[in-house]
């Protein structure tokens, strides 16, 4: 069924197809149809960050930036749903076209630029949703906020989403907001994380609950840089790391149509690079902080490979675009079939 739907959707421009798919998934969720039409994955509960997940396969941020289809995605069988990236104020993102399919490589290039309707709108959608599972909210900074003032934007979003999120992801790794990735390193990273950790403890007291903080990092780092990031995350008291965002590299797609477009590359070509980051993080963290693996999962076995590399959970986005809900079931089954330690 999804194969036919994809053939029709892929005749449209990528962004039109994305918006239409979001509308359809959202409508199906409101009507309660998605769970009926889609075969559900096997139960595979797991506890991570003190949260109970129905299964370890989640929706990565970016597909539902404004929380428009939370119930719809949950009904497809995802073990958790992450929405955003959301910024304090609404912003249009980068000029179109800004989203490109590379079907020969099962890949996508995007330079969306955190287009979203703002944190207040997102929270309206969260409050309207019936979903009671694990909901992550991914936060970022506005395009016109100087990098030196980025912490202000993250704190605004943290304050607003805190009471509505199961966990909060701090996105410092999108390649489409100038200067953002510089926040992953050195004093910039430590100052940001320390500010977030301090405010989180205050919010925990006010709300009577401690909401986990996850940091999403890029795949375009050396082993040494990754090790330094891991050390800073532990020192600052973060609860998880998401590895990884899209890559600026173009290995394997250089000669394909749209392969030279600016933006972040996701899908199959980022699998090896992303999984390597997971392995490095796992060695550095030594089990002291869970890893949520994202990047390049287009087959169920890729999800199992991420878990074997040291991840506790996985997320999919580009693979879902190409494979549909079947990939969720396939990934859950592959993880369930792994030998127990």
From Swiss-Prot:
Keywords: Cell membrane, Flavoprotein, FMN, Membrane, Oxidoreductase, Pyrimidine biosynthesis. Its cofactor is FMN. It is an enzyme of class 1 (oxidoreductase). It holds the Pfam family DHO_dh. FMN binds at residues 61-65, 85, 138, 171, 216, 244, 267, 296, 317-318. It is a peripheral membrane protein. Its EC number is 1.3.5.2. It catalyses: (S)-dihydroorotate + a quinone = orotate + a quinol. Pathway: Pyrimidine metabolism; UMP biosynthesis via de novo pathway; orotate from (S)-dihydroorotate (quinone route): step 1/1. One of its GO terms (molecular function) is dihydroorotate dehydrogenase (quinone) activity. Binds 1 FMN per subunit. InterPro entries: Aldolase_TIM, DHO_dehydrogenase, Dihydroorotate_DH_1_2, Dihydroorotate_DH_2, Dihydroorotate_DH_cat, Dihydroorotate_DH_CS. PROSITE patterns: DHODEHASE_1 (PS00911). Substrate binds at residues 65, 110-114, 171, 176, 245-246. The keyword Cell membrane applies. It comes from the Bacteria. One of its GO terms (biological process) is 'de novo' UMP biosynthetic process. One of its GO terms (cellular component) is cytoplasm. Belongs to the dihydroorotate dehydrogenase family. Type 2 subfamily. Monomer. Catalyzes the conversion of dihydroorotate to orotate with quinone as electron acceptor. This is Dihydroorotate dehydrogenase (quinone). It comes from Pseudomonas putida (strain W619).
């Amino acid at each position: 069924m999804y194969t036919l739907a994809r053939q029709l959707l892929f005749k449209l421009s990528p962004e039109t197809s994305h918006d239409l798919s979001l509308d359809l998934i959202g409508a199906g969720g409101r009507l309660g149809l998605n769970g009926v039409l889609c075969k559900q994955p096997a139960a595979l509960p797991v506890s991570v960050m003190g949260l109970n997940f129905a299964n370890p396969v989640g929706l990565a941020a970016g597909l539902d930036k404004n929380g428009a289809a939370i119930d719809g995605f949950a009904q497809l069988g995802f073990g958790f749903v992450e929405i955003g990236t959301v910024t304090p104020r609404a912003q249009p993102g980068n000029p179109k076209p800004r989203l490109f399919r590379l079907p020969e490589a099962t890949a996508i290039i995007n330079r969306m630029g955190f287009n979203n309707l703002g944190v207040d709108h997102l929270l309206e959608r969260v409050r309207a949703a019936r979903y009671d599972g694990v909901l992550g909210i991914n936060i970022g900074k506005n395009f016109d906020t100087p990098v030196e003032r980025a912490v202000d934007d993250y704190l605004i979003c943290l304050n607003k989403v805190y009471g509505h999120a199961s966990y909060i992801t701090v996105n410092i790794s999108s390649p489409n907001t100038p200067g953002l990735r510089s926040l992953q390193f050195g004093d910039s990273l430590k100052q940001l994380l320390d500010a977030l950790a301090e405010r989180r403890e205050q919010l925990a007291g006010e709300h009577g609950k401690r909401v986990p903080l996850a940091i999403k990092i890029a795949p375009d780092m050396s082993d040494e840089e990754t090790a330094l990031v891991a050390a800073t995350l532990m020192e600052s008291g973060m609860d998880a790391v998401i590895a990884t965002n899209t890559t600026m590299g173009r290995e394997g797609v250089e000669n394909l149509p749209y392969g030279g477009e600016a933006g972040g590359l996701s899908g199959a070509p980022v699998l090896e690079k992303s999984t390597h980051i997971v392995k490095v993080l796992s060695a550095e963290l030594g089990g002291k902080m869970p890893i949520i693996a994202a990047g390049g999962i287009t087959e169920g076995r890729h999800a199992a490979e991420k878990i074997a590399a040291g991840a506790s959970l996985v997320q999919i986005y580009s693979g879902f675009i190409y494979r549909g809900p079947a990939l969720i079931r396939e990934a859950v089954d592959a993880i369930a079939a792994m030998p127990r330690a």
